[in-house]
From Swiss-Prot:
Residues 1-89 are annotated as: Disordered. This is Forkhead box protein D3. Residues 1-13 have a biased composition (Low complexity). The gene is foxd3. Transcriptional repressor that is an essential upstream regulator of neural crest determination. Also acts in a negative auto-regulator loop by inhibiting the transcription of its own gene.
Length: 369
């Protein structure tokens, strides 16, 4: 600390002496500036600082320059590669498959082509589809079969070859707007001819309850009155088809069959036969021995109720009689006799043996109390 202090003091004294001498010579003080500049330039510290600054600038400039040069070389190489590389990326044509098929059919002399002919035209006309073949062939096939604007024509017997011909529907000529294949109007739908429509209406009316015009077969939103076609008036002799199976016949007692409302429709002989059958069944039930256990239907609701329930349990009216009850229409005597005769001709002993259980079997089934 003493050395630095003494040196600084001597410097200060030297500066004061020089300043005092210079005060007489140079009053303005212009001579100080060149002295300072010369001292700064002549000092080694100043040279070192300048060298460091220049070196830093050169280092800062050198990476950016090398990066720019590398980018320029990379771009030039890419451009050269693009020029030397062939153009394989082809653009897909802006036409739909329907438009392509229509082009192929219209350019043919006979206005009809097979599937292979349509694909050949598209491949020759558009290089994009030539490279992608046969990936789009199924799309052409689906468009031919799903669109009404294309009509399939069977191949003639004498014309050898494979596949059917396809042509355009005459009513679909204006499906493209102003003849431009880029703009297509709404989806074309083939109209049904009037003659075919009348035949369809006749078939629908002739099927009756199972027809498409029935309550469960007509299209949604159409009233049944909409199907009153003139064909029904032209052919009044075609009856509607009734149900294939008769309705289910519930079991009715013989007393129900012998009521006034129904007995007036049957002949006296049938009434006598039915009444005799019911009385025979009742007598068989009453004649059973009373050696039954205490728990029985007779003890709960009485013997009279059991006798009235027994015919209801074991007797079943014929189908024709029940249908007469349901429809309230008189039956012919011959049909009724032919239908009921086999049932009424069965002997009573067979009925009692087959349908009525014996007392011994009934006792064996119930536990003894």
């Amino acid at each position: 600390m003493t050395l630095s202090g003494s040196s600084s003091a001597s410097d200060m004294s030297g500066q004061t002496v020089l300043s005092a001498d210079d005060a007489d010579i140079d009053v303005v003080g212009e001579g100080d500036e060149p002295l300072d500049k010369d001292s700064e330039c002549g000092s080694p510290a100043g040279h070192a600082e300048e060298a460091d600054e220049l070196g830093g600038k050169e280092i800062a400039r050198s990476p950016s320059g090398s990066a720019n040069e590398a980018e320029g070389k990379g771009e030039s190489q890419q451009q050269e590669g693009m020029q030397n590389k062939p153009k394989n990326s082809l653009v897909k044509p802006p036409y739909s498959y329907i438009a392509l098929i229509t082009m192929a059919i219209l350019q043919s002399p006979q206005k009809k082509l097979t599937l292979s002919g349509i694909c050949e035209f598209i491949s020759n006309r558009f290089p994009y589809y030539r490279e992608k073949f046969p990936a789009w062939q199924n799309s052409i096939r689906h468009n031919l079969s799903l669109n009404d604007c294309f009509v399939k024509i069977p191949r003639e017997p004498g014309n050898p070859g494979k596949g059917n011909y396809w042509t355009l529907d005459p009513q679909s000529e204006d499906m493209f707007d102003n003849g431009s294949f880029l703009r297509r109007r709404k989806r074309f739908k083939r109209q049904q001819p009037d003659s075919l429509r009348e035949q369809t209406a006749l078939m629908m009316q002739s099927f009756g309850a199972y027809s498409l015009a029935g309550p469960y077969g007509r299209p949604y939103g159409l009233h049944p009155a909409a199907y009153t076609h003139p064909a029904a008036l032209q052919y009044p002799y075609i009856p509607p088809v009734g149900p294939m199976l008769p309705p289910a016949v519930p079991l009715l007692p013989s007393s129900e069959l012998s009521r006034k409302a129904f007995s007036s429709q049957l002949s006296p002989s049938l009434q006598l036969q039915l009444s005799s059958l019911s009385s025979t069944a009742a007598s068989i039930i009453k004649s059973e021995p009373s050696s039954r256990p205490s728990f029985s239907i007779e003890n709960i609701i009485g013997v009279s109720a059991a006798s009235s329930i027994a015919p209801q349990t074991f007797l079943r009216p014929p189908v024709t009689v029940q249908s007469a009850l349901m429809s309230h229409q008189p039956l012919a005597l011959s049909r009724s006799t032919a239908a009921i005769g086999p049932i009424l001709s069965v002997p009573t002993n067979l009925i009692s043996g087959q349908f009525l259980p014996t007392a011994a079997a009934a006792v064996a089934k119930w536990p003894a109390q």
